[in-house]
């Protein structure tokens, strides 16, 4: 197997998919700030206190469901999890455009936090299934770049939609791409290298062998107590740089 060719195939096939998926998640998470400037607070009677509550509800869902999402992605399927999340967060984003009261908006923001909580850990697990230890730093960097790049084009698109139509239409329109992309994701993505047809059998075997070799000697962490007693975790927490 030519490892360089193998890495190139994986890089050009997988990373654009990862980048687009994470960008869409950030889009549906961050466009509320544009709506706030465009009049959603006045239209729905959102006070400063309610605005703080809405933000807290989003991150409450995000906080409590990130670990369960990561566990499902690791033990079951990143492909299935992200497919469901894409449909739900796109639907929640579009539903935000038709709400007329604060309780409905609060429920949507909480659900949006829940379904988006799994995105980052699931993407990291997906990358670890496809890239070796020496390749993951670059792959993870490309994933994180989805945030600032999305801000650049989202500012232009959201500003145009608000100017041309209004904040309601902005939410409805910007939620649609996530739903459409869910079906693209389902067709394009497989959880493991062994499941794809665009790698040769020898390439799959060599990649899986290297990934398995890297996992040897790594002790599984079964609970939070073990995690906090880990030497690496203690050193990380003690690092004040």
Q: What is the predicted function of each stretch?
A:
Residues 143-196:
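Helix-loop-helix hairpin linking two adjacent transmembrane segments in secondary transporters
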């Amino acid at each position: 197997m030519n490892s360089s060719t193998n890495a190139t195939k994986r890089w050009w096939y997988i990373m654009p998919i990862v980048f687009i998926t994470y960008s869409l998640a950030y889009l549906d998470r961050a466009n509320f700030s544009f709506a706030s400037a465009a009049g959603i607070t006045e239209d729905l009677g959102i006070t400063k206190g309610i605005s703080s509550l809405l933000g807290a509800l989003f991150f409450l869902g995000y906080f409590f469901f990130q670990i369960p999402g990561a566990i499902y992605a690791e033990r079951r399927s990143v492909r299935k999890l992200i497919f469901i999340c894409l449909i739900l967060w796109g639907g929640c984003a579009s539903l935000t455009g038709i709400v007329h009261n604060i309780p409905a908006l609060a429920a949507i923001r909480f659900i949006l936090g829940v379904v988006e909580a799994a995105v980052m850990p699931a993407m990291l697990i997906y990358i670890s299934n496809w890239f070796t230890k020496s390749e993951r730093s670059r792959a993870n960097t490309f994933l994180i770049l989805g945030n600032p790049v999305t801000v650049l084009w989202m500012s232009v698109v959201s500003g145009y939609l608000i100017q041309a139509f209004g904040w309601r239409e902005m939410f409805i329109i910007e939620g649609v791409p996530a739903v459409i992309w869910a079906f693209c994701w389902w067709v394009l993505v497989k959880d493991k290298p062994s499941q794809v047809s665009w790698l040769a059998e020898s390439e799959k075997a060599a990649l899986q062998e290297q990934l398995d070799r890297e996992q040897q000697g790594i002790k599984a962490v079964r609970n939070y107590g073990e995690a906090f007693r880990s030497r690496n975790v203690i050193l990380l927490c003690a690092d004040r740089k």
